[in-house]
């Protein structure tokens, strides 16, 4: 197996000082939600561990995961792609095309057998022997199985690879399936979202490269560090929910005052993601902050769960302190009555309080 440069080797070759390198390690620790004590461990890993070869495949998808990934700010995607990893194949970002690109894929698989990470964006269709998605003249499902067999680990980018997403929505004429239905003998890290948050994507890669292991996963295979809590739990509109202050109609007084969007379809109470903490566009905002309810794009089968603007009505009661593992997949899948009751009771109390005022 050929030797790869370490991340620190690459940074020194680029003229980056030791001080800047240590500063980068501190910022990386902060971006991962780790304390300052982890900065030396990250620095040691960057100095001693070789850059990991990554092969990035594309199946049925819209490329929104790649679009999100290249906009990462912490760390910058240029540092990830050019220094931290060795992105040896990605037909969307690489300069080579056609036979040259496929030759690069085969060469990396041969040189780094059992050492490379497979990243998958999109999913494979099974109908008509996979002919609904062709890459390099062959069905994508063949390429996926071929590259996965010698991978050290697999990352499923986005809801397409993790759950199936819109391609697998009813009636699913191509029989698109998530990649875990095809790859059954490799560890898979699911990073759902349509698309996932940029810093979540780079954070997962950084963790794997730094600590040499998969991040802690929940029962559905998602990193707990980013998918351990509901968006509802950390939402800045949560106090309005508890106070029974809701947007009833778009552009009503409640909407203008920034009240809770639960009654106009927000799926935050049943969606596990880091949107309300990490946010989007370098931490600028997220859909709820922009005035639109969460559509639950990181959850399994969200396209087939009714209108984006339909109020949830079957959510079982569970507290803010609960996480995905404690609640379990069954509860997270069956969604609404207690929250609906809570909303009704708090609204009635508000009306009563108004009536008591002189």
Swiss-Prot record:
It is a peripheral membrane protein. One of its GO terms (biological process) is anaerobic respiration. Residues 1-45 form the signal peptide. Binds 2 [4Fe-4S] clusters. Binds 1 [3Fe-4S] cluster. InterPro entries: Cytochrome-c3_hydrogenase_C, NADH_UbQ_OxRdtase-like_20kDa, NiFe-Hase_small_C_sf, NiFe_Hase_small_N_sf, NiFe_hydrogenase_ssu, TAT_signal, TAT_signal_bac_arc. Predicted to be exported by the Tat system. The position of the signal peptide cleavage has been experimentally proven. PROSITE patterns: TAT. SUPFAM superfamilies: HydA/Nqo6-like. Its cofactor is [4Fe-4S] cluster; [3Fe-4S] cluster. Keywords: 3Fe-4S, 4Fe-4S, Cell membrane, Iron, Iron-sulfur, Membrane, Metal-binding, Oxidoreductase, Signal. [4Fe-4S] cluster 2 binds at residues 232, 235, 260, 266. Its EC number is 1.12.99.6. One of its GO terms (molecular function) is ferredoxin hydrogenase activity. [3Fe-4S] cluster binds at residues 275, 294, 297. This enzyme recycles the H(2) produced by nitrogenase to increase the production of ATP and to protect nitrogenase against inhibition or damage by O(2) under carbon- or phosphate-limited conditions. This is Uptake hydrogenase small subunit.
